[in-house]
Amino acid sequence: MAAKELSHLQQLEAESIQIIREVAAEFDNPVMMYSIGKDSSVMLHLARKAFYPGKIPFPLLHVDTDWKFKEMIAFRDAQAKEFGFELLVHKNPDGIEMGVGPFTHGSAKHTDIMKTQGLKQALNKYGFDAAFGGARRDEEKSRAKERVYSFRDKHHTWDPKNQRPELWRTYNGAVNKGESIRVFPLSNWTELDIWQYIYQESIELVPLYFAQKRPVVERDGMMIMVDDDRLPLEEGETVKDELVRFRTLGCYPLTGAMYSEADTLEKIIEEMLLTRSSERQGRLIDSDQSASMELKKRQGYF
């Protein structure tokens, strides 16, 4: 009797689970980054599957910039309570003390201090030697050339010209003291794969991904949701309730919504089949300068 062939999603799932298990076995102190978005939700689901019926044997880390959507924070805390995983939350205390924010310091400086430097602080504080991330190669060109095991030096910086070969899904995890790796189990997934897997597995998501009426202002060609009273209105701006959803999530002043009527998973998948634009076009931090994502990654960003 012929062995049952795995579907495309089953193959991706098996590959990701194998990577998660291998890192958990090989490294002394791994951690899973948890940004609360759809990719993080899929990665969390895969980690739960990888070690079922036991608990996930490593903590989840959220680097909180203090500017995330309120719904994201509520969802994060609800997921930790429901599934019982260890959740670590880190805010850059220096950035908080300086009052760093996207309006006072600009998107580039805010991202560097609150996300990149905050992440490096947390990794140093807890001594993690491997950190899982939900990045995919189809997202952005600098991520397209990054390995599944992405090596970082003692300063957490990345050298794209000095990456190790990964042949036949064989990964070299040897690191020197003080070095670490970033691990991307979803490297070979596409955005459509993610949505189809979410539908197949009935994975719960932040409601921001689904279309509904939300208060937004149009600014610099993007629709920014008014999530709290810290968003200052510029001259001539008015807040309007529009039927929108978010394709990607980050700090709310730096994340653009899109017009959409997709309020179910089926409608979102149908929308994805027709779209011809990048999901990260709604992320202001990616347009700070040419090759901005690669520069951020070289400096220690995920």
UniProtKB/Swiss-Prot annotation:
It is an enzyme of class 2 (transferase). The keyword Transferase applies. GO terms for biological process: hydrogen sulfide biosynthetic process; sulfate assimilation. One of its GO terms (molecular function) is sulfate adenylyltransferase (ATP) activity. InterPro entries: PAPS_reduct_dom (IPR002500), Rossmann-like_a/b/a_fold (IPR014729), SO4_adenylTrfase_ssu (IPR011784), Sulfate_adenylyltrnsfr_sub2 (IPR050128). Pfam families: PAPS_reduct. Belongs to the PAPS reductase family. CysD subfamily. Heterodimer composed of CysD, the smaller subunit, and CysN. This is Sulfate adenylyltransferase subunit 2. It comes from Shewanella piezotolerans (strain WP3 / JCM 13877).
